[in-house]
Protein backbone atom coordinates (compact mmCIF):
# COMPACT_ATOMS: atom_id res chain seq x y z
CA UNK A 1 0.00 0.00 0.00
CA UNK A 2 2.86 2.38 0.78
CA UNK A 3 4.49 1.71 -2.59
CA UNK A 4 1.22 2.38 -4.37
CA UNK A 5 0.76 5.67 -2.56
CA UNK A 6 4.36 6.66 -3.21
CA UNK A 7 4.03 5.84 -6.91
CA UNK A 8 0.74 7.53 -7.66
CA UNK A 9 0.97 10.50 -5.33
CA UNK A 10 4.76 11.04 -5.68
CA UNK A 11 5.32 11.32 -1.97
CA UNK A 12 8.83 12.49 -1.16
CA UNK A 13 10.17 12.15 -4.73
CA UNK A 14 10.16 15.19 -6.98
CA UNK A 15 11.77 13.43 -9.96
CA UNK A 16 8.89 11.05 -10.63
CA UNK A 17 6.21 13.66 -10.06
CA UNK A 18 3.84 13.77 -13.04
CA UNK A 19 3.07 17.10 -14.72
CA UNK A 20 -0.17 18.86 -13.85
CA UNK A 21 -3.15 17.59 -15.83
CA UNK A 22 -5.45 19.98 -17.74
CA UNK A 23 -8.98 20.50 -16.38
CA UNK A 24 -11.86 18.48 -17.69
CA UNK A 25 -13.44 20.21 -20.71
CA UNK A 26 -17.08 21.23 -21.00
CA UNK A 27 -18.96 19.18 -23.61
CA UNK A 28 -22.38 20.80 -23.24
CA UNK A 29 -21.84 23.18 -26.14
CA UNK A 30 -20.69 20.39 -28.44
CA UNK A 31 -23.68 18.24 -27.39
CA UNK A 32 -26.08 21.04 -28.26
CA UNK A 33 -24.49 21.43 -31.69
CA UNK A 34 -24.60 17.68 -32.34
CA UNK A 35 -28.26 17.30 -31.28
CA UNK A 36 -29.58 19.92 -33.69
CA UNK A 37 -31.68 18.13 -36.36
CA UNK A 38 -31.45 20.96 -38.90
CA UNK A 39 -27.66 20.68 -39.23
CA UNK A 40 -26.61 19.25 -42.65
CA UNK A 41 -24.35 16.18 -42.67
CA UNK A 42 -21.76 18.00 -44.80
CA UNK A 43 -21.03 20.44 -42.01
CA UNK A 44 -19.84 17.71 -39.69
CA UNK A 45 -16.46 17.24 -41.39
CA UNK A 46 -15.89 20.99 -41.23
CA UNK A 47 -16.68 21.04 -37.55
CA UNK A 48 -14.46 18.07 -36.93
CA UNK A 49 -11.59 19.55 -38.89
CA UNK A 50 -12.08 22.88 -37.18
CA UNK A 51 -11.96 21.13 -33.86
CA UNK A 52 -8.85 19.23 -34.93
CA UNK A 53 -7.12 22.52 -35.72
CA UNK A 54 -7.70 23.90 -32.24
CA UNK A 55 -5.36 22.88 -29.42
CA UNK A 56 -5.75 22.28 -25.70
CA UNK A 57 -9.18 21.34 -24.35
CA UNK A 58 -10.79 21.35 -27.80
CA UNK A 59 -8.99 18.11 -28.79
CA UNK A 60 -11.16 15.93 -26.59
CA UNK A 61 -14.30 17.66 -27.83
CA UNK A 62 -13.15 17.04 -31.41
CA UNK A 63 -12.78 13.34 -30.73
CA UNK A 64 -16.17 13.09 -29.05
CA UNK A 65 -17.90 15.03 -31.84
CA UNK A 66 -16.41 12.93 -34.66
CA UNK A 67 -17.03 9.59 -33.00
CA UNK A 68 -20.52 10.45 -31.83
CA UNK A 69 -20.01 9.43 -28.18
CA UNK A 70 -20.41 12.25 -25.65
CA UNK A 71 -19.10 11.97 -22.09
CA UNK A 72 -21.10 12.95 -19.05
CA UNK A 73 -21.25 16.57 -17.96
CA UNK A 74 -19.02 17.54 -15.11
CA UNK A 75 -21.40 20.22 -13.90
CA UNK A 76 -22.63 23.61 -14.81
CA UNK A 77 -20.13 26.05 -16.31
CA UNK A 78 -20.46 29.76 -15.96
CA UNK A 79 -21.00 32.07 -18.90
CA UNK A 80 -17.64 33.71 -18.20
CA UNK A 81 -15.73 30.49 -18.88
CA UNK A 82 -17.70 29.85 -22.09
CA UNK A 83 -16.96 33.36 -23.33
CA UNK A 84 -13.30 32.91 -22.45
CA UNK A 85 -13.07 29.67 -24.42
CA UNK A 86 -14.80 31.19 -27.43
CA UNK A 87 -12.41 34.13 -27.38
CA UNK A 88 -9.46 31.73 -27.02
CA UNK A 89 -10.56 29.78 -30.08
CA UNK A 90 -10.77 33.01 -32.06
CA UNK A 91 -7.38 34.25 -30.83
CA UNK A 92 -5.49 31.00 -31.42
CA UNK A 93 -7.14 30.11 -34.68
CA UNK A 94 -4.96 28.18 -37.12
CA UNK A 95 -4.29 30.43 -40.15
CA UNK A 96 -4.23 27.40 -42.47
CA UNK A 97 -6.93 25.09 -41.09
CA UNK A 98 -9.04 27.47 -38.98
CA UNK A 99 -12.77 27.99 -39.63
CA UNK A 100 -12.20 31.34 -41.32
CA UNK A 101 -9.09 30.59 -43.40
CA UNK A 102 -9.28 30.79 -47.19
CA UNK A 103 -7.10 27.70 -47.60
CA UNK A 104 -9.56 25.67 -45.54
CA UNK A 105 -12.46 26.84 -47.69
CA UNK A 106 -10.53 25.98 -50.86
CA UNK A 107 -9.77 22.50 -49.59
CA UNK A 108 -13.39 21.94 -48.64
CA UNK A 109 -14.53 22.98 -52.14
CA UNK A 110 -11.95 20.74 -53.81
CA UNK A 111 -12.93 17.83 -51.55
CA UNK A 112 -16.59 18.21 -52.47
CA UNK A 113 -15.78 18.50 -56.19
CA UNK A 114 -13.51 15.48 -56.08
CA UNK A 115 -16.00 13.32 -54.23
CA UNK A 116 -18.90 14.44 -56.42
CA UNK A 117 -17.06 13.84 -59.71
CA UNK A 118 -15.74 10.41 -58.85
CA UNK A 119 -18.80 8.66 -60.22
CA UNK A 120 -19.37 6.54 -57.12
CA UNK A 121 -22.60 6.78 -55.12
CA UNK A 122 -20.79 6.69 -51.84
CA UNK A 123 -18.34 9.40 -52.64
CA UNK A 124 -19.64 11.84 -50.04
CA UNK A 125 -19.64 9.21 -47.35
CA UNK A 126 -16.09 8.20 -48.24
CA UNK A 127 -14.87 11.76 -48.08
CA UNK A 128 -16.68 12.31 -44.82
CA UNK A 129 -15.30 9.18 -43.25
CA UNK A 130 -11.78 9.93 -44.46
CA UNK A 131 -11.86 13.47 -43.14
CA UNK A 132 -13.36 12.40 -39.84
CA UNK A 133 -10.79 9.65 -39.46
CA UNK A 134 -7.98 12.06 -40.23
CA UNK A 135 -9.41 14.59 -37.82
CA UNK A 136 -9.67 11.95 -35.11
CA UNK A 137 -6.10 10.84 -35.70
CA UNK A 138 -4.88 14.42 -35.57
CA UNK A 139 -6.80 15.10 -32.36
CA UNK A 140 -5.62 11.96 -30.61
CA UNK A 141 -2.01 12.90 -31.28
CA UNK A 142 -2.66 16.51 -30.21
CA UNK A 143 -1.07 17.70 -33.43
CA UNK A 144 -0.81 21.25 -34.67
CA UNK A 145 -2.36 22.72 -37.82
CA UNK A 146 0.48 21.56 -40.04
CA UNK A 147 0.23 18.00 -38.74
CA UNK A 148 -3.52 17.90 -39.32
CA UNK A 149 -3.04 19.15 -42.86
CA UNK A 150 -0.42 16.48 -43.53
CA UNK A 151 -2.62 13.69 -42.14
CA UNK A 152 -5.65 14.82 -44.12
CA UNK A 153 -3.62 15.11 -47.32
CA UNK A 154 -2.50 11.49 -47.07
CA UNK A 155 -6.09 10.20 -47.37
CA UNK A 156 -7.73 12.83 -49.56
CA UNK A 157 -7.98 12.56 -53.29
CA UNK A 158 -6.20 15.77 -54.30
CA UNK A 159 -2.64 15.46 -52.95
CA UNK A 160 -1.24 18.51 -54.78
CA UNK A 161 -3.26 20.84 -52.58
CA UNK A 162 -1.84 19.42 -49.36
CA UNK A 163 1.78 18.55 -50.10
CA UNK A 164 4.65 20.83 -50.86
CA UNK A 165 6.42 20.77 -54.22
CA UNK A 166 9.29 18.71 -52.81
CA UNK A 167 6.91 15.98 -51.53
CA UNK A 168 4.76 15.61 -54.62
CA UNK A 169 4.90 12.39 -56.59
CA UNK A 170 3.02 11.27 -59.64
CA UNK A 171 -0.02 9.15 -58.89
CA UNK A 172 1.52 5.92 -60.16
CA UNK A 173 -0.73 2.89 -60.61
CA UNK A 174 -0.46 -0.08 -58.31
CA UNK A 175 0.93 -2.32 -61.03
CA UNK A 176 4.30 -0.54 -61.22
CA UNK A 177 6.82 -2.69 -59.41
CA UNK A 178 9.28 -0.04 -58.21
CA UNK A 179 8.75 3.58 -57.23
CA UNK A 180 11.74 5.79 -57.91
CA UNK A 181 12.83 8.14 -55.13
CA UNK A 182 13.36 11.82 -55.70
CA UNK A 183 15.91 12.80 -58.40
CA UNK A 184 16.66 9.21 -59.33
CA UNK A 185 16.39 7.32 -62.61
CA UNK A 186 15.23 3.74 -62.16
CA UNK A 187 14.84 1.21 -64.91
CA UNK A 188 11.53 -0.52 -64.17
CA UNK A 189 11.54 -4.19 -65.13
CA UNK A 190 9.03 -6.95 -64.53
CA UNK A 191 9.46 -10.70 -64.15
CA UNK A 192 10.27 -12.93 -67.11
CA UNK A 193 6.75 -14.34 -67.47
CA UNK A 194 4.76 -11.19 -66.78
CA UNK A 195 4.77 -9.76 -70.29
CA UNK A 196 1.43 -10.98 -71.63
CA UNK A 197 -0.85 -10.89 -68.62
CA UNK A 198 0.18 -7.51 -67.23
CA UNK A 199 0.02 -4.71 -69.82
CA UNK A 200 1.52 -2.07 -67.60
CA UNK A 201 4.19 -4.40 -66.32
CA UNK A 202 5.03 -5.50 -69.84
CA UNK A 203 5.23 -1.92 -70.97
CA UNK A 204 7.45 -0.94 -68.12
CA UNK A 205 9.50 -4.07 -68.65
CA UNK A 206 10.53 -2.64 -71.99
CA UNK A 207 13.28 -0.69 -70.31
CA UNK A 208 11.65 2.72 -69.96
CA UNK A 209 13.67 4.96 -67.69
CA UNK A 210 11.70 7.68 -65.95
CA UNK A 211 12.15 10.30 -63.24
CA UNK A 212 9.38 11.03 -60.71
CA UNK A 213 10.17 14.74 -60.59
CA UNK A 214 10.44 15.21 -64.33
CA UNK A 215 7.36 13.38 -65.62
CA UNK A 216 3.91 12.96 -64.11
CA UNK A 217 1.72 9.92 -63.74
CA UNK A 218 -0.25 10.53 -66.93
CA UNK A 219 2.92 10.84 -68.96
CA UNK A 220 4.14 7.54 -67.54
CA UNK A 221 0.86 5.81 -68.40
CA UNK A 222 0.95 7.16 -71.95
CA UNK A 223 4.54 5.96 -72.39
CA UNK A 224 3.72 2.55 -70.99
CA UNK A 225 0.69 2.21 -73.28
CA UNK A 226 2.70 3.28 -76.33
CA UNK A 227 5.52 0.90 -75.51
CA UNK A 228 3.00 -1.93 -74.94
CA UNK A 229 1.52 -1.33 -78.39
CA UNK A 230 4.94 -1.23 -80.05
CA UNK A 231 6.62 -4.10 -78.22
CA UNK A 232 3.80 -6.64 -77.98
CA UNK A 233 6.11 -9.46 -79.06
CA UNK A 234 7.86 -11.34 -76.27
CA UNK A 235 11.16 -11.84 -78.13
CA UNK A 236 12.12 -8.20 -78.67
CA UNK A 237 15.16 -6.75 -76.98
CA UNK A 238 15.00 -4.14 -74.26
CA UNK A 239 15.90 -0.62 -75.29
CA UNK A 240 17.09 2.05 -72.91
CA UNK A 241 15.57 5.42 -73.69
CA UNK A 242 16.27 8.44 -71.55
CA UNK A 243 13.05 10.37 -70.95
CA UNK A 244 14.63 13.52 -69.51
CA UNK A 245 17.93 15.33 -69.10
CA UNK A 246 19.30 13.14 -66.31
CA UNK A 247 22.19 10.76 -66.87
CA UNK A 248 21.80 7.01 -67.16
CA UNK A 249 21.49 4.96 -63.97
CA UNK A 250 24.24 2.57 -63.05
CA UNK A 251 22.20 -0.50 -64.04
CA UNK A 252 21.07 0.73 -67.45
CA UNK A 253 22.42 -1.09 -70.47
CA UNK A 254 24.82 0.69 -72.80
CA UNK A 255 23.44 -0.71 -76.05
CA UNK A 256 22.90 2.66 -77.65
CA UNK A 257 26.29 3.93 -76.52
CA UNK A 258 28.07 0.89 -77.93
CA UNK A 259 26.22 1.23 -81.22
CA UNK A 260 27.00 4.92 -81.42
CA UNK A 261 30.65 4.28 -80.61
CA UNK A 262 31.03 1.89 -83.55
CA UNK A 263 30.04 4.53 -86.06
CA UNK A 264 31.88 7.75 -86.73
CA UNK A 265 31.54 10.05 -83.78
CA UNK A 266 30.43 13.62 -84.37
CA UNK A 267 32.06 14.88 -81.17
CA UNK A 268 35.17 16.96 -80.66
CA UNK A 269 37.93 14.85 -82.23
CA UNK A 270 40.45 17.48 -83.26
CA UNK A 271 43.10 16.60 -80.66
CA UNK A 272 43.00 12.97 -81.72
CA UNK A 273 43.21 13.94 -85.40
CA UNK A 274 46.11 16.25 -84.69
CA UNK A 275 47.87 13.50 -82.78
CA UNK A 276 47.32 11.09 -85.65
CA UNK A 277 48.77 13.59 -88.13
CA UNK A 278 51.80 14.19 -85.93
CA UNK A 279 52.35 10.45 -85.59
CA UNK A 280 52.24 10.06 -89.36
CA UNK A 281 54.65 12.95 -89.80
CA UNK A 282 57.10 11.49 -87.29
CA UNK A 283 56.92 8.13 -89.02
CA UNK A 284 57.78 9.73 -92.36
CA UNK A 285 60.67 11.61 -90.77
CA UNK A 286 62.02 8.41 -89.27
CA UNK A 287 61.85 6.73 -92.69
CA UNK A 288 63.78 9.64 -94.22
CA UNK A 289 66.43 9.54 -91.54
CA UNK A 290 66.91 5.81 -92.12
CA UNK A 291 67.58 6.40 -95.80
CA UNK A 292 70.26 8.99 -94.95
CA UNK A 293 73.71 8.05 -93.75
CA UNK A 294 74.48 7.75 -90.07
CA UNK A 295 75.40 11.11 -88.57
CA UNK A 296 78.87 11.64 -87.23
CA UNK A 297 78.03 12.08 -83.55
CA UNK A 298 75.11 9.63 -83.32
CA UNK A 299 77.21 6.43 -83.17
CA UNK A 300 80.85 7.58 -83.08
CA UNK A 301 82.51 4.24 -82.33
CA UNK A 302 80.28 1.84 -84.28
CA UNK A 303 81.04 0.72 -87.83
CA UNK A 304 78.99 2.09 -90.69
CA UNK A 305 79.01 -1.15 -92.71
CA UNK A 306 75.94 -2.75 -91.15
CA UNK A 307 75.00 -4.54 -94.40
CA UNK A 308 78.39 -6.27 -94.76
CA UNK A 309 78.52 -10.05 -94.44
CA UNK A 310 79.74 -11.65 -91.24
CA UNK A 311 82.93 -12.96 -92.93
CA UNK A 312 84.16 -9.58 -94.12
CA UNK A 313 82.86 -7.64 -91.11
CA UNK A 314 85.77 -8.70 -88.91
CA UNK A 315 88.29 -7.24 -91.36
CA UNK A 316 86.41 -4.03 -92.07
CA UNK A 317 85.32 -3.10 -88.55
CA UNK A 318 88.79 -2.32 -87.06
CA UNK A 319 89.54 0.11 -89.86
CA UNK A 320 86.18 1.80 -89.46
CA UNK A 321 86.59 2.04 -85.71
CA UNK A 322 90.00 3.63 -86.19
CA UNK A 323 88.61 6.14 -88.65
CA UNK A 324 85.89 7.16 -86.19
CA UNK A 325 88.30 7.94 -83.39
CA UNK A 326 88.66 11.67 -82.57
CA UNK A 327 92.37 11.80 -83.47
CA UNK A 328 91.56 10.61 -87.00
CA UNK A 329 88.79 13.14 -87.46
CA UNK A 330 89.62 15.52 -90.30
CA UNK A 331 86.99 18.10 -89.48
CA UNK A 332 87.96 21.67 -88.54
CA UNK A 333 88.42 22.52 -84.89
CA UNK A 334 85.42 24.86 -84.66
CA UNK A 335 83.14 21.90 -85.36
CA UNK A 336 83.57 20.71 -81.76
CA UNK A 337 82.12 23.91 -80.36
CA UNK A 338 78.62 22.86 -81.36
CA UNK A 339 76.62 20.33 -79.34
CA UNK A 340 76.27 16.89 -80.85
CA UNK A 341 72.57 17.28 -81.68
CA UNK A 342 73.09 20.53 -83.58
CA UNK A 343 73.70 19.38 -87.10
CA UNK A 344 73.94 21.79 -89.97
CA UNK A 345 72.19 19.40 -92.32
CA UNK A 346 69.14 18.83 -90.15
CA UNK A 347 68.85 22.38 -88.77
CA UNK A 348 69.44 24.84 -91.62
CA UNK A 349 68.47 27.86 -89.50
CA UNK A 350 71.23 27.17 -87.00
CA UNK A 351 73.63 26.47 -89.84
CA UNK A 352 72.90 29.87 -91.32
CA UNK A 353 73.38 31.46 -87.92
CA UNK A 354 76.76 29.79 -87.40
CA UNK A 355 77.85 30.68 -90.91
CA UNK A 356 76.89 34.28 -90.25
CA UNK A 357 78.94 34.29 -87.05
CA UNK A 358 81.97 32.92 -88.88
CA UNK A 359 81.68 35.57 -91.56
CA UNK A 360 81.34 38.22 -88.89
CA UNK A 361 84.46 36.98 -87.13
CA UNK A 362 86.50 36.80 -90.32
CA UNK A 363 85.48 40.28 -91.47
CA UNK A 364 87.20 43.29 -89.85
CA UNK A 365 85.23 44.94 -87.10
CA UNK A 366 83.50 48.20 -87.98
CA UNK A 367 85.06 49.91 -84.98
CA UNK A 368 88.53 49.34 -86.38
CA UNK A 369 87.47 50.71 -89.73
CA UNK A 370 85.97 53.68 -88.00
CA UNK A 371 89.22 54.29 -86.13
CA UNK A 372 91.13 54.16 -89.36
CA UNK A 373 88.69 56.50 -91.07
CA UNK A 374 88.89 59.09 -88.32
CA UNK A 375 92.18 60.27 -89.67
CA UNK A 376 92.37 61.67 -93.13
CA UNK A 377 94.98 60.32 -95.56
CA UNK A 378 96.94 63.54 -95.27
CA UNK A 379 97.24 63.22 -91.52
CA UNK A 380 94.44 65.69 -90.80
CA UNK A 381 91.18 65.08 -88.99
CA UNK A 382 87.95 64.03 -90.58
CA UNK A 383 85.20 66.52 -89.77
CA UNK A 384 82.31 64.87 -87.91
CA UNK A 385 78.89 66.40 -87.43
CA UNK A 386 77.23 66.82 -84.04
CA UNK A 387 74.52 64.20 -84.56
CA UNK A 388 76.77 61.48 -85.94
CA UNK A 389 77.42 58.28 -83.95
CA UNK A 390 81.14 59.09 -83.76
CA UNK A 391 80.35 62.16 -81.67
CA UNK A 392 81.17 60.61 -78.28
CA UNK A 393 84.50 59.20 -79.41
CA UNK A 394 85.83 55.69 -79.33
CA UNK A 395 85.49 53.58 -76.22
CA UNK A 396 88.77 52.44 -74.67
CA UNK A 397 91.01 54.18 -77.17
CA UNK A 398 94.69 53.51 -76.68
CA UNK A 399 96.84 56.60 -76.93
CA UNK A 400 100.11 56.39 -78.83
CA UNK A 401 102.59 58.69 -77.08
CA UNK A 402 104.89 58.78 -80.14
CA UNK A 403 102.28 60.59 -82.22
CA UNK A 404 102.55 64.38 -81.97
CA UNK A 405 99.86 66.31 -80.13
CA UNK A 406 98.49 67.98 -83.22
CA UNK A 407 97.72 64.58 -84.78
CA UNK A 408 95.92 63.12 -81.77
CA UNK A 409 92.15 62.71 -82.21
CA UNK A 410 91.36 64.09 -78.74
CA UNK A 411 93.17 67.39 -79.32
CA UNK A 412 90.71 70.15 -80.22
CA UNK A 413 93.01 73.15 -80.44
CA UNK A 414 91.93 76.61 -79.39
CA UNK A 415 88.33 76.13 -78.24
CA UNK A 416 86.71 77.85 -75.32
CA UNK A 417 85.65 76.29 -72.06
CA UNK A 418 81.97 76.54 -73.00
CA UNK A 419 82.51 74.72 -76.28
CA UNK A 420 84.39 71.97 -74.49
CA UNK A 421 81.53 71.56 -72.02
CA UNK A 422 79.01 71.44 -74.85
CA UNK A 423 80.98 68.63 -76.46
CA UNK A 424 81.32 66.71 -73.19
CA UNK A 425 77.68 67.19 -72.27
CA UNK A 426 76.60 64.59 -74.84
CA UNK A 427 79.23 62.07 -73.75
CA UNK A 428 79.43 59.61 -70.88
CA UNK A 429 81.50 59.80 -67.72
CA UNK A 430 85.32 59.69 -68.04
CA UNK A 431 85.19 61.28 -71.49
CA UNK A 432 87.96 63.82 -72.07
CA UNK A 433 89.53 66.19 -74.56
CA UNK A 434 92.60 68.47 -74.64
CA UNK A 435 92.47 72.11 -75.74
CA UNK A 436 94.67 75.17 -75.60
CA UNK A 437 94.60 77.14 -72.38
CA UNK A 438 92.87 80.50 -72.52
CA UNK A 439 95.06 82.09 -69.81
CA UNK A 440 98.54 80.93 -70.88
CA UNK A 441 99.87 80.62 -74.37
CA UNK A 442 102.22 77.68 -73.74
CA UNK A 443 99.92 75.64 -71.50
CA UNK A 444 97.07 73.24 -72.24
CA UNK A 445 93.82 72.33 -70.48
CA UNK A 446 92.35 68.86 -69.92
CA UNK A 447 88.52 68.92 -69.87
CA UNK A 448 86.90 65.87 -68.23
CA UNK A 449 83.29 64.75 -67.78
CA UNK A 450 82.59 63.46 -64.27
CA UNK A 451 79.46 62.33 -62.50
CA UNK A 452 79.15 65.73 -60.84
CA UNK A 453 79.64 67.84 -63.96
CA UNK A 454 82.72 69.07 -65.80
CA UNK A 455 86.30 69.41 -64.60
CA UNK A 456 89.03 71.49 -66.24
CA UNK A 457 92.65 70.67 -65.27
CA UNK A 458 95.70 72.58 -66.37
CA UNK A 459 98.65 70.92 -68.14
CA UNK A 460 101.41 73.34 -67.16
CA UNK A 461 104.84 73.37 -68.80
CA UNK A 462 107.76 73.67 -66.37
CA UNK A 463 111.42 73.34 -67.53
CA UNK A 464 110.50 71.46 -70.72
CA UNK A 465 108.25 69.10 -68.77
CA UNK A 466 104.47 68.87 -68.55
CA UNK A 467 102.71 68.37 -65.23
CA UNK A 468 99.01 67.66 -64.70
CA UNK A 469 97.83 69.69 -61.73
CA UNK A 470 100.25 69.81 -58.82
CA UNK A 471 100.82 66.18 -57.77
CA UNK A 472 101.54 64.36 -61.04
CA UNK A 473 105.02 63.32 -62.16
CA UNK A 474 106.58 65.34 -65.01
CA UNK A 475 106.24 64.13 -68.61
CA UNK A 476 108.05 65.06 -71.78
CA UNK A 477 104.92 65.61 -73.86
CA UNK A 478 101.16 65.93 -73.49
CA UNK A 479 100.45 62.56 -75.25
CA UNK A 480 102.62 60.84 -72.62
CA UNK A 481 100.52 62.41 -69.85
CA UNK A 482 97.28 61.22 -71.48
CA UNK A 483 98.74 57.77 -72.14
CA UNK A 484 99.85 57.45 -68.51
CA UNK A 485 96.45 58.32 -67.02
CA UNK A 486 94.44 56.08 -69.33
CA UNK A 487 95.40 53.18 -67.05
CA UNK A 488 95.76 55.05 -63.74
CA UNK A 489 93.63 57.23 -61.52
CA UNK A 490 93.89 60.98 -61.79
CA UNK A 491 95.78 62.82 -58.97
CA UNK A 492 93.14 65.56 -58.86
CA UNK A 493 90.96 66.30 -55.85
CA UNK A 494 87.40 65.26 -56.65
CA UNK A 495 88.49 62.97 -59.51
CA UNK A 496 90.48 60.33 -57.65
CA UNK A 497 88.23 57.55 -58.97
CA UNK A 498 88.38 58.65 -62.61
CA UNK A 499 90.62 57.75 -65.50
CA UNK A 500 90.88 58.97 -69.08
CA UNK A 501 88.83 56.33 -70.84
CA UNK A 502 86.83 57.86 -73.68
CA UNK A 503 88.47 60.47 -75.88
CA UNK A 504 86.15 62.87 -77.66
CA UNK A 505 87.19 62.95 -81.29
CA UNK A 506 85.11 65.87 -82.44
CA UNK A 507 86.26 69.03 -84.22
CA UNK A 508 84.17 72.17 -84.38
CA UNK A 509 83.14 73.15 -87.88
UniProtKB/Swiss-Prot annotation:
Which UniProt keyword terms apply here?
Angiogenesis, Apoptosis, Cell membrane, Cytoplasm, Developmental protein, Differentiation, Isopeptide bond, Membrane, Phosphoprotein, SH2 domain, Ubl conjugation
Q: How does it sit in the membrane?
A: Peripheral membrane protein
Q: How is it modified after translation?
A: Phosphorylated upon PDGFRA, PDGFRB, TCR, IL2 receptor, FGFR1 or VEGFR2 activation.
- Name assigned to this protein: SH2 domain-containing adapter protein B
Q: Which organism is it from?
A: Homo sapiens (Human)
Q: Where is the composition biased (Basic and acidic residues)?
A: 233-242, 250-262, 319-334
Q: How does it assemble?
A: Interacts with PTPN11. Interacts with phosphorylated 'Tyr-720' of the ligand-activated receptor PDGFRA via its SH2 domain. Interacts with the ligand-activated receptors PDGFRB, FGFR1, KDR/VEGFR2, IL2RB and IL2RG. Interacts with EPS8 and V-SRC. Interacts with GRB2 and GRAP. Interacts with CD3Z. Interacts with tyrosine-phosphorylated LAT upon T-cell antigen receptor activation. Interacts with PLCG1. Interacts with ZAP70, LCP2/SLP-76, VAV1 and GRAP2. Interacts with JAK1 and JAK3. Interacts with PTK2/FAK1. Interacts with CRK/CrKII. Interacts with IRS2.
**Description of its domains:** The SH2 domain preferentially binds phosphopeptides with the consensus sequence Y-[TVI]-X-L and mediates interaction with PDGFRA, PDGFRB, FGRFR1, IL2RB, IL2RG, CD3Z and CRK/CrKII.
Q: State the protein's purpose.
A: Adapter protein which regulates several signal transduction cascades by linking activated receptors to downstream signaling components. May play a role in angiogenesis by regulating FGFR1, VEGFR2 and PDGFR signaling. May also play a role in T-cell antigen receptor/TCR signaling, interleukin-2 signaling, apoptosis and neuronal cells differentiation by mediating basic-FGF and NGF-induced signaling cascades. May also regulate IRS1 and IRS2 signaling in insulin-producing cells.
Amino acid sequence: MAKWLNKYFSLGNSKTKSPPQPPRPDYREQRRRGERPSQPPQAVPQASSAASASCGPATASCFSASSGSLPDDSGSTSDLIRAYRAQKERDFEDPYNGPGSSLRKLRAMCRLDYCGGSGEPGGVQRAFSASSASGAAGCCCASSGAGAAASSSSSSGSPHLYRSSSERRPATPAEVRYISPKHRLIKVESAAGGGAGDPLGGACAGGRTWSPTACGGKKLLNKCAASAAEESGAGKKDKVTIADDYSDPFDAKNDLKSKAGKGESAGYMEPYEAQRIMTEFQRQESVRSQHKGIQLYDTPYEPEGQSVDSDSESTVSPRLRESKLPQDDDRPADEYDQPWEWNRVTIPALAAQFNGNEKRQSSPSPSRDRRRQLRAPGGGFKPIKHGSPEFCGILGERVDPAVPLEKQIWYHGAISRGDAENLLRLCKECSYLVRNSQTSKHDYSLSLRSNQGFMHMKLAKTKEKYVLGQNSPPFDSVPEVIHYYTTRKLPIKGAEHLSLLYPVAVRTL
